[in-house]
Structures are given as structure tokens and as C-alpha cells.
Amino acid sequence: MNKFKVILRRFWKLILGGIIVFTAVILLSNYWVEQSAKEKTFSTIESIPYNPTGLVLGTSKKVRGGNINLYFKYRMEAAVELFNAGKIKFIIVSGDNSIMEYNETRDMKKALVEMGIPEDKIVEDFAGFSTLDSVLRAKEVFGQDSITVISQEFHNKRAVFIAKNHDIYALGFNAQNVPQRYGTVTITREYFARVKAILDVYVLGSMPKFYKDKEAFPNEE
């Protein structure tokens, strides 16, 4: 019985130690990303500098049940606000089109055109399967090494972190956040996404799934 208690005690110590390490990794990763993006994300038009190219990070247009996805809605509004204020000249809409029935990129372009953005100012990136793919393809595929990322603040910070570590000058324009009751799961996932971002940059050396074929980009003149 005493031997069993010793084994059980060691088992719980291992579990506790694992939880402590796991929590520390998440907190340190979050701090690392936050510091890397410090003073690189902006919430007002007046404060953000000009950058020729905006990069809208993709998300689904609608949520389950058919209602509009507020993350999508607010990102489109932020992109239009930037464009109309002359803070960007072109917009890359980068999203997932891995299956025929699901096309974030086309949905974003359609929404922006309906909101008054000229079609010739929008560039479609159909292979933005992840934040890393979208950010790195802006440079590797479209030749843009200076971008303004357009998403919610928590997402922008991770995108800026990724960009900074791949020699891309990136700012973030923070779209309106969604009410907390709708965004709890997304925010929780973001903590784990930041751990993955650090692994992608410093351990795995991850690159986009498709990035070797260059695509034309409009001339700024």
C-alpha cells in the first residue's frame, strides 16, 4: 500500500509539473508576441502611417446558423476605412479556398466591391490557409515587403510577429472586436496559436504551402 501511495504521489507530481510547464509556455509565448508587436498595431485612422498595401486576413463570411460573422464584417469595414482615408492603395484579400464550396477570398472581394472599393485595387490570394501563409505569401508571391495587416488586434499582433521575423515591415490596423460572448473560443485558441507561431518561426522554419510561383501585382504609380 505504501508503495502504491509513493507511485500515486509521483504521478500527481508529474501531472502538476506538466501543467506548470504548459502554462508557462503559453504565458511566455503570449508575452513574446505582445512585445514583438508593441507599437505596431493601431486602432485609429489618424494614428496609422501610410502603407501601399493592406492585407486582409480571411475568415468565413457566416457562422453556423447563417448569421453574418462579425469578424468578417468588421474586417471589411476596417479595410474600406483605410482605403477611403488614403492610408492604403491596394488590398490583398487572403483566405482559404481549399475546397470549391468554401471561398473566403471571393467573399471578401465581393463584400469590398459592394462597399465601393474598385476591383482593380483588390488582389486575390486563394492560398491563405493560415496567418503564416497569408503574411509570407504577400512577400514571396506578390512581392510586398511592406504591408498593413487588417484584422482584430489579437490576430494582428501574431501576424506582425510573423512578419517581423521574415524581414517584412508590417503594421496592424485593428478592426472592431466582437462582443466577448461571441469571441471567447477564438481568444482562447489565440493563446495556442501564438505558441505555434513561435514554433513555426524558431523551430520548424515553416513556409506557406504554396509560395514559389510569383503572381503579378498592380503598379503603385
Outline where the language-model segments fall.
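A transmembrane-helix-recognition feature enriched in membrane-embedded lipid enzymes
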Residues: 187-206
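Coil-to-alpha-helix initiation sites in intrinsically disordered, low-complexity, charged segments
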Residues: 2-6, 183-186, 190
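A structural signal for short, hydrophobic/glycine-enriched beta-strand patches
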Residues: 31-187
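Short linear elements at protein peripheries
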Residues: 207-221
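N-terminal type II signal-anchor transmembrane helix
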Residues: 3-46
